[in-house]
Curated annotation (Swiss-Prot):
Cofactor needs: adenosylcob(III)alamin
Chain spans, region Adenosylcobalamin-binding-1: 570-631
Keywords, in A-Z order: Allosteric enzyme, Cobalamin, Cobalt, Disulfide bond, DNA replication, Oxidoreductase, Redox-active center
Pfam families, A to Z: RNR-II_ins_dom, RNR_Alpha
Organism field: Lactobacillus helveticus (strain DPC 4571)
Protein name per the record: Adenosylcobalamin-dependent ribonucleoside-triphosphate reductase
Region annotation (Effector region-1) ranges: 148-159
Regulation of catalytic or functional activity: Allosterically regulated by ATP and dNTP.
EC id: 1.17.4.2
Record bears the keyword Oxidoreductase: yes
Amino acid sequence: MPATRITLDSTFIDQVKHEIKPHWGELGWVTYKRTYARWLPEKNRTENWDETVKRVIEGNINLDPRLQDLPSQDVIDKLTNEAQQLFRLVYSLSATPSGRNLWISGTDYQKRNGDSLNNCWFIAIRPQAYGDSHIVPTYIDKRKEAVSMPFSFLFDQLMKGGGVGFSVVDDNINQIPQVDHQVDLSVVIDKNSKSYDASLKVGAIDKAEWEKNNSGLDNVIYYRIPDTREGWVLANARLIDLHFNDTNPDQKTKLVLDISDIRPYGAKIHGFGGTASGPMPLVEMFFDINNVINERVGQKLTAVDATDICNLIGKTVVAGNVRRSAELALGSSDNQDFIKMKQDKEKLYHHRWASNNSVAINSKFNNYGPIADGIMHNGEPGIVNLDLSRNYGRIADGYQAGIDDDVEGTNPCGEISLANGEPCNLFEVFPYIAEQQGWDLKEAFSLAARYTKRVTFSHYDWEVSRNIIQKNRRIGVSMSGIQDWLLNDLGHRVVTGFKDATDKETGAPIKKPIYDPQGIKMVDGLYHAVIAADKAYSEELGVNPSIKHTTVKPSGTVAKLAGVSEGMHFHYAGYLIQRIRFQASDPLLPALRKCGYHTEPDIYTKNTICVEIPLRAAHADSKNFASAGTVSIAEQFATQAFLQTYWSDNAVSCTVTFQANESNQIAPLLHQYRHTIKSTSLLPYYGGSLKQAPKEPINKKAYEDRVAMITGDVKEVFENQNKDQKGLELVDQSDCTSGACPIK
């Protein structure tokens, strides 16, 4: 806790509520209420928007390290003023911190878990030391490298709600020693456990029976798993490490894991929220991971094996909670077993769905044919160019040898290149909305830079993370609603055409994009505002400037709050039906029905109701409007290249959509932009072909007919009904186009 605490008083907040109207999108308030509004037990309801923003801003501003001592009145006054400006910015929905910050900032959970403010992480799958971390197995020295460590890091961060990118490239996997032992695993449970019968069905055995048959065995490792996140991680670490001589010096090969203390299915999880899965998914995971490693005795684990272990962990984390586990596996570009691993449909449906898979390349790579073929069939692999990430900030600023030399991978959505153990740290501004709300964009982006800088002063649980964060202090200031903003301010899209050119290295003909000069000037000016803000704040705090500063995040759920296009992506359609799914007991449903929204039972999930909300994109009727269904694959690549060149010194998250007749352009375009785009992924455009599709394009008349049926304001109706409930979330919502990121 800081010695001095900055707070926002009620008089100020009441004044802002009187002066500013939040720019809610059509889906905005409902999405907020079911995703980011925390339960207030003393008021027997969830937060209102002003209460959420107050919590979030106070949680952030008090991370300023000067408050740990006795700061001057000048510092207190300036930080109070900054907190007020941030409150205005976020309350108006001109900008928001990441969904993770909206959910966690200012809570007791944040104070206990410094990691909790960062959305996503990256870890290299190779033996590493645990170091001075909150989780260290008792059977090894904290400085000793262990095969289990990166898997423990991934398991821990996933359970704290973060996404994790992980690298299984050859250089990492080759460092894992050969598997020395098969492990004979037993999982036991006490008859008194509420999970007893269900656990026996998935392979556990009666504890008393096991003890009767195995008394006096001294070659057994017995571990009673505590009902904690750390307990789950340590049990899995013990299982993995017993297979290797370096971490099993006694060469004991029988392991007994006692799950009797683990809370049953449906019990509440305090802190992050959600409900417990019971021990059953954990039991299945233990046996599955043990089988993967046992099959490699006398050999080394492969990239596919390591990815399977990570996927099995991810599957377990998902099992009992609405929130999704987000993983990105990064493999070597010539590892065909890795590239094709999802073609095994049985394993895909069992656990390999748990990660999006990408390959690491450099700018000399030219074998895009097999990659394009995979993309056409299942949308994978994505591409991550580590050479560009290590040696470039913005492409416009040219080659800077080793400017980010520790980079080994990326977060699951690909917008931040990361070193081992490093997290992304995000905040986004909606320039189209901010201008409408009267903001000077440079001030808005400067506030964003300072917000993210403070997050780097959190207390981090893992030593590997603390070290790299203190070195890099990487921030990710993003902009979203980019298509809305550029079309509004320029009158047209930023790519104004293409001209014939030749590839300087190969001589091949290419179509070089032409960018609006004013568009370049707009984003360049904002980039330099972020750099200046970070430099000034770093000097105030006496720390290094951030190694990189800007990005474009995919921004699915957060963009819905303000009703803008998602990140750099084009609106899915000018007019569409957005379907969102609610638990059938949700008290928001009567309010939605009363206001005229169409609801129907979900055809995929029991006890779930599908609500249809008609949406109109900003500028849908403009002759220069383009949607994901009409914009060309070439223009999407060119737009991503524009942002990577002039705005983002990290990377740009983009899922390029393509029509069937454009698939032959994938490989040539990937090659054309090999010196510009740091990471990208592609998916076929499906339109509304699936039943109860999340997004279904419609025409203007259908939209107007739907809107005419809607009467009343859901927020007002819901508040008048006064039937709020605790612990409800939207069902199976997606935070980005690729589905790679956690919800919050």
